[in-house]
């Protein structure tokens, strides 16, 4: 008998990992982290996967990381896309998109730990993340000499994980939060080539999380806009991802929203509703854009000039509790145009609310795309 497999590997090289024809994603496993690639051997020109994490501290300093395997990566830059973003409390921000030819995942079948490295052929530039299963922790390490270096860690908080809930973000995308609520530390240095200066983001009091998602159709073919946010305020943690489908697909709203209170998952909407809706039989998210720049909130720089959202989480069942929150754009993190009118905007969000009579306050990180 042969040796038992000690690890499984997914090694993507930009030159040969993209193939014609059909490819199938491996199945989602309820209750598990599902971090290892679902398309572990190849992707085609439609399928893709993303892993991302972000966090900020109470002052509004934060870092964000994105890792992507998609066919357009080869067309756009000749390598798998890695994004690193930083923001400081004074509004200064930093952005870098890398195109790296190799993306490697290794999972230990004994420990369940997963390490992913995105790198150049000679390994002179590399960005990696490691999931420590026993500790429920993600470590991100950046080694881009003369550009950015350092480490950020996301330690999962105790309590409900939400991993047993559905990952379906509409019919074509699966979305999960393997370490969805985390205490975060950062020790990163960023270089600014324009003036030759460097800035540090070093803290041990941040909050954030690590998400991953995968899909079988191109973003542009299924969505007209999207909004992502994770926020920590008092005893609450809010997690939202919502897609709005294209005109051809009926402008449907596809959300995966989660509300935690003191570590317990109290509301898990998989649908959006209207403020006056009656007879709600499922947890529901009511989400309304606002345009109140007179309050000092920022607006996006593209054709959608919203300054934030009003949110209501509605619990199904006899209790039918309602939690309401205001979300307002406080600090711009990034702003990237998409096409003639659309764009991708990121913000530090000021979030306030709770149950009736509560005024919990805190900060979050959001990303908003409009086409």
Curated annotation (Swiss-Prot):
Q: Which Pfam families match?
A: DA_C, DA_N
Protein name in the entry:
Diels-Alderase pvhB
Q: In which pathway does it act?
A: Secondary metabolite biosynthesis
UniProt-listed InterPro entries: DA_C
Keywords carried by this UniProt record:
Isomerase
Q: Which gene encodes it?
A: pvhB
* Any one GO MF annotation of this record: isomerase activity
Function field: Diels-Alderase; part of the gene cluster that mediates the biosynthesis of varicidin A, an antifungal natural product containing a cis-octahydrodecalin core. The PKS module of pvhA together with the enoylreductase pvhC catalyze the formation of the polyketide unit which is then conjugated to L-isoleucine by the condensation domain of the NRPS module. Activity of the Dieckmann cyclase domain (RED) of pvhA results in release of an acyclic tetramate. The cytochrome P450 monooxygenase pvhE then catalyzes the oxidation of the C21 methyl group to a to carboxylate group.
Family that this chain belongs to: Belongs to the Diels-Alderase family.
**Which Enzyme Commission number(s) are listed?**
5.5.1.-
């Amino acid at each position: 008998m042969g040796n038992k497999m000690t690890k499984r590997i997914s090694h993507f090289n930009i030159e040969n990992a993209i193939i014609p024809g059909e490819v199938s994603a491996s199945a989602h496993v309820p209750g598990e982290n599902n971090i290892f690639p679902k398309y572990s051997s190849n992707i085609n020109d439609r399928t893709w996967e993303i892993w991302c994490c972000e966090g900020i501290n109470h002052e509004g300093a934060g870092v964000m990381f994105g890792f992507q395997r998609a066919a357009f990566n080869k067309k756009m830059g000749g390598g798998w896309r890695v994004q690193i973003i930083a923001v400081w409390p004074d509004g200064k921000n930093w952005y870098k998109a890398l195109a790296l030819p190799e993306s490697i995942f290794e999972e230990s079948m004994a420990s369940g730990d997963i390490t992913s490295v995105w790198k150049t052929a000679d390994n002179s530039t590399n960005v990696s993340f490691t999931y420590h299963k026993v500790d429920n922790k993600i470590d991100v390490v950046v080694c881009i000499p003369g550009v950015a270096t350092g480490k950020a860690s996301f330690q999962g908080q105790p309590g409900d994980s939400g991993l047993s809930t559905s990952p379906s973000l509409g019919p074509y995308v699966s979305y999960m939060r393997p370490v969805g609520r985390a205490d975060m530390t950062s020790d990163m240095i960023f270089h600014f080539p324009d003036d030759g200066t460097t800035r540090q983001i070093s803290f041990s009091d941040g909050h954030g999380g690590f998400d991953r998602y995968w899909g079988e159709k191109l973003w542009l073919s299924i969505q007209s806009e999207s909004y992502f946010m994770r926020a920590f305020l008092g005893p609450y943690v809010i997690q939202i991802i919502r897609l709005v489908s294209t005109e051809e697909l009926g402008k449907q709203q596809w959300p995966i929203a989660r509300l935690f209170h003191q570590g317990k998952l109290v509301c898990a909407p998989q649908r959006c509703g209207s403020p006056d809706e009656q007879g709600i039989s499922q947890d529901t998210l009511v989400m309304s854009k606002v345009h109140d720049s007179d309050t000092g909130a920022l607006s996006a720089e593209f054709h959608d000039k919203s300054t934030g959202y009003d949110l209501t989480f509605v619990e199904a069942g006899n209790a039918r509790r309602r939690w309401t929150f205001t979300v307002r754009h406080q600090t711009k993190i990034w702003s990237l145009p998409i096409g003639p009118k659309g764009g991708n905007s990121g913000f530090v969000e000021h979030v306030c609310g709770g149950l009736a009579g509560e005024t919990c306050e805190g900060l979050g990180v959001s990303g908003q795309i409009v086409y």
